[in-house]
Regions:
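HIT superfamily nucleotide-processing domains
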Residues: 1-133
Length: 133
């Protein structure tokens, strides 16, 4: 049975699931920030995936990147797999704009997260679910 890292569980809200990955919304209202987590236990690196799952994950990254681009018309889409704190393989996909608080630097560690208010979270999740299923 697949287990999501407790830190990801604590810091995100579920949006949907794809063939390979769970799609999670980072609980930071300042950024359109999604995280893909492949439903495979014991993985920490991209190369830990088999070839078919690598291709599927790449497809899912493109789906999310294009969807965020349509929804938010960002200046840039950042895609990254760091894993220095949370070892479980997960991919961050963040729509960035020149007026966001961390621009042009990374969103990680810039400042404490600003959690979604309940109504804003419901609206954001509804839009994301409509876009991604």
């Amino acid at each position: 049975m697949f287990r999501l890292d407790p830190r990801l569980e604590q810091d995100t809200h579920g949006v949907t699931s794809f063939a390979l990955s769970r799609v999670l919304l980072m609980n930071d209202a300042r950024y359109p920030w999604l995280i893909l987590v492949p439903n495979r236990n014991g993985l920490s690196e991209l190369h830990d995936l088999n070839a078919a799952d690598q291709a599927r994950l790449n497809d899912e990254i493109i789906i999310v990147s294009r969807g965020l681009a349509r929804m938010f018309t960002p200046e840039k889409i950042n895609v990254g797999a760091l894993g220095n704190i949370v070892r479980q393989l997960h991919i961050h996909i963040v729509a960035r704009n020149t007026d966001d608080p961390a621009w042009p630097g990374p969103v990680w560690g810039h400042s404490p997260a600003v959690p979604y208010a309940a109504d804003a979270l419901a609206e954001r999740r509804s839009r994301l679910t409509a876009e991604f299923g």
